């Protein structure tokens, strides 16, 4: 925070469980994929070496589960665990590197407890078969499904303010009848 951070390489060398997440929009990245890329670049700049992409993967999956003491329920794909899964477009053969070089446009599907909550409109039948009621939204000029009503939230904010407000941390694009 504020251009200072702990010596990550030293923590890893000593076997300390290091997790990575989005802390705040003030000092961190706006989403976890951006945070992964930022952490990777920071490590390369700070230490003059690459941080293993597998280590970065663990820093956003199994390590946080251990930190919160929920590793028996979350943090890895295993029988009996909660199926919170992100499916990305495969641009690179190595899955860890693919994750570390992905951005929001790479996200094809997000499952929460095994059910779709966000994804490509090409997966419409999957959303329907799961019983998910999804709203069609635009993020970065791409049509997506989201199991929520961000449009209603944005309309409510616009109505309260009297104008359409762009929120950097909430990249949903919504057309309004009354606001340009």
Q: What do the PLM-derived regions correspond to, one by one?
A:
Residues 58-180:
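Active-site microenvironment of metallo-dependent hydrolases
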Residues 1-79, 83-93, 101-102:
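Active-site-adjacent C-terminal substructures of enzyme catalytic domains
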């Amino acid at each position: 925070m504020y251009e200072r951070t702990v010596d990550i390489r030293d923590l890893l060398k000593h076997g300390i469980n290091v997790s990575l997440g989005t802390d705040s929009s003030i000092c961190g990245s706006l989403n976890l994929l951006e945070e992964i890329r930022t952490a990777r670049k920071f490590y390369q700049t700070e230490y003059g070496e690459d941080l293993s992409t597998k280590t970065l993967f663990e820093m956003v999956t199994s390590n946080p589960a251990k930190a919160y003491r929920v590793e028996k329920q979350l943090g890895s794909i295993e029988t009996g665990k909660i199926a919170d899964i992100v499916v990305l477009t495969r641009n690179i053969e190595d899955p860890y590197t693919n994750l570390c070089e992905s951005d929001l446009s790479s996200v094809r599907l997000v499952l929460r407890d095994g059910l779709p909550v966000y994804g490509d409109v090409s997966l419409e039948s999957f959303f329907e078969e799961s019983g998910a009621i999804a709203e069609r939204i635009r993020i970065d000029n791409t049509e997506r499904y989201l199991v929520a009503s961000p449009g209603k939230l944005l309309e409510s904010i616009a109505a309260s303010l009297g104008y359409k407000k762009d929120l950097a941390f909430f990249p949903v694009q919504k057309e309004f009848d009354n606001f340009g």
